[in-house]
Amino acid sequence: INKKSDEEIEEMLKGNDVFIYAAGVDERVEFPHPVMDYYDKFNNAPLRRIFPLCKKVGVKRAVVLGSYFAYLTKSRPDMGLQQRNPYFKARMMQEDICKNAVDDNFSTCVLELPYIFGTQPGRKPVWTILIEQLKMMDNLPFTLYPKGGTAMLTCRQVGQAIAGAAVREKAGFEAIPVAMYNMKWDKFLKIVYEARGMGPNRKIVGVQPWMMKLGMIGIAKDYKKRGIESGMDPFNLPDIMNLDLFINNQYTKELGVQEDDIEAAITDSIRVSQASYDGKVKLLEMKGE
């Protein structure tokens, strides 16, 4: 979209009621300092440009795919997450852009999405990063991991949430935390290990944040050596992963999202991620443009 002129985008928008923004990058894509410039370029600047074009041609509503880290930031102001994590700050700025775009004839809705499982044909799942982390502990009789948990949903459910938000007749701005399932990390990892062919009985040992922070020292040094500014503070991540970052699914059900097989979706994601990690398949990675 960044390669198209305003006039070309207007032609694409004409005759439509809703604009859906499902583009951009998340915290797992690496950028040099200052990382905020890249989050603005890929996640936020397109909205500042396209919203006025939407209004010009009569589009009435926009649905933007955001992050549940914005939901966490608002839920836990005591943690100072915006100050420590550029990605969180960028997602909050994205919601402000959406909020400020609202008028009597234009509404906006941000779907604050958690971890998503399932596969898209030809696209590399983000979970190859998890495979890399776990491989380092494969020779141990147990896996060390934080004690918290996360909200989640499947690819199919994301599509249903988008469709529900698109036809939702609600004026103004709203940010909806979206999830259908909540799962502790230890239960999640047992599904992961079974998907990797290592059986369902892998021992998972929960660790305190301070222990994980020790492991982050090397990662922080690696970032510095390579000139990378992480979107998430490596020394704040253990505190975040120690939380039960759960979401009540009542909001998601209001969008018309139906039940799905989350364990099968996790299994599919991990199997494709493992195949990608092993070099058995070539897939398209996440990128800004």
What residues fall within each predicted segment?
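Conserved beta-loop-beta element that borders a ligand/cofactor-binding pocket
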Residues: 98-122
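Terminal hydrophobic/aromatic helix or amphipathic segment near a protein terminus
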Residues: 189-245
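Conserved Rossmann-fold NAD(P)-dependent oxidoreductase catalytic core, especially the SDR/UDP-sugar
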Residues: 45-91, 109
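A conserved pocket-lining segment of Rossmann-fold NAD(P)-dependent short-chain dehydrogenase/reductase
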Residues: 132-153
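Amphipathic terminal alpha-helices
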Residues: 242-289
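Glycine/proline-rich active-site loop of Rossmann-fold NAD(P)-dependent oxidoreductases
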Residues: 118-131, 165-176, 198-200
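NAD(P)H-binding glycine-rich loop region in Rossmannoid oxidoreductase-like domains
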Residues: 1-45, 49, 71
